[in-house]
Design a protein with these regions (language model features):
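Alpha-helical transmembrane segments and their short interhelical loops
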Residues: 105-181, 227-251
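Hydrophobic alpha-helical transmembrane segments of multi-pass membrane transport proteins
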Residues: 39-46, 62-134, 163, 179-182, ...
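Short, membrane-interfacial amphipathic segments enriched in basic
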Residues: 1-13, 159, 202-213
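Membrane-interfacial helix-loop-helix junctions in multi-pass membrane proteins
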Residues: 139, 190-244
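Aromatic- and glycine-rich beta-strand/loop motifs that create alpha-glucan
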Residues: 1-36
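Transmembrane helix segments
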Residues: 48-49, 167-209, 213
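Short cytosolic juxtamembrane segments of multi-pass membrane proteins
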Residues: 254-261
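Short helix-capping/hinge motifs at transmembrane helix termini and TM-loop junctions
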Residues: 44-53, 77, 131-143, 167-172, ...
Length: 261
């Protein structure tokens, strides 16, 4: 078997195992990523609906403004599941058994990352459909949906890398749980909830360097149907930078773990 075929086989093996594990606990695997985003579009958009009366607010409804952020929030709540599973494999010795087969370490990581992307894309589509059902306007077409999914996949790969770095470094599931509230400062210091022009100056500065701002803005343009490919380019640059930072850290942490064992 060629190296490429072996790598593809190993990656597929890990992906199928991850899917099988998720089917045994579908609520945590597929339900958890959509709970808070659905709360955002179903409750928060109603509570803060009058914010559109503020002069300069650029959307016709708060739901229209918040829906793209809720769509991308699925990645922030979907991340950590596979990283927790990998830490469990380390603790139980299953990772050692995989290495004896042998399964490529890169395939182990890639298979789990692909599973994370699949889970989050499904969750994102559910939230997008729910947003439109609740009344969020969607002015785009099929290509705009594809653009939104690309942005979501990039954000998922970048954000989930944080969990792999912490999990593989600490080998502790409890340490991973500490990262869950990280979505709060990241989303608050962005354009997710209010336009940057209406925020205090220091928040505007923080939002301008926050990659979440750029992916949310891109998703917002795609959802409105007014997107240009430059919007996707900005999201790719922001998401790509985060991916390079976190996934490189995850790869180095995984390599150190394998050497230590």
């Amino acid at each position: 078997m060629s190296n490429l075929r072996a790598f593809t086989h190993d990656t597929s093996l890990i992906l199928r195992r991850s899917l099988a594990q998720a089917r045994r606990g579908p609520v945590l695997a597929f339900g958890f990523p959509i709970v808070f985003p659905l709360l955002m579009i179903g409750l928060f958009s109603q509570i803060y609906s009058r914010i559109t009366n503020v002069p300069g607010f650029p959307a016709t409804s708060y739901l229209a403004w918040m829906a793209p952020a809720a769509f991308l929030m699925t990645a922030m709540f979907g991340s950590g599941y596979s990283a927790t599973g990998l830490v469990t494999d380390v603790q139980t010795g299953y990772l050692d058994r995989l290495r004896l087969i042998p399964v490529s370490p890169a395939a182990i990581m890639l298979g789990r990352l692909l599973f994370d992307v699949v889970r989050v894309l499904i969750a994102g589509l559910v939230v997008l459909v729910a947003s439109v059902a609740f009344g969020a306007p969607f002015g785009g077409g099929p290509l705009d949906v594809v653009g939104m999914l690309i942005v979501l996949a990039l954000w998922t790969l970048g954000y989930t890398g944080l969990f792999y770095v912490v999990g593989l470094t600490s080998r502790s599931q409890q340490k991973l749980a500490v990262l869950i509230p990280a979505f709060l400062p990241i989303s608050l210091l962005s354009s997710a909830y209010i336009p940057r022009s209406l925020a205090p100056h220091w928040v505007q500065v923080a939002a301008s360097i926050n990659p979440y701002t750029h992916v949310v803005d891109a998703a917002r343009h795609f959802m409105s149907g007014n997107a240009h490919w430059s919007d996707l380019a900005g999201a790719v640059l922001a998401g790509g930078a985060l991916i390079a930072l976190t996934q490189l850290g995850a790869a180095r942490a995984f390599a150190r773990l394998l050497r230590a064992d």
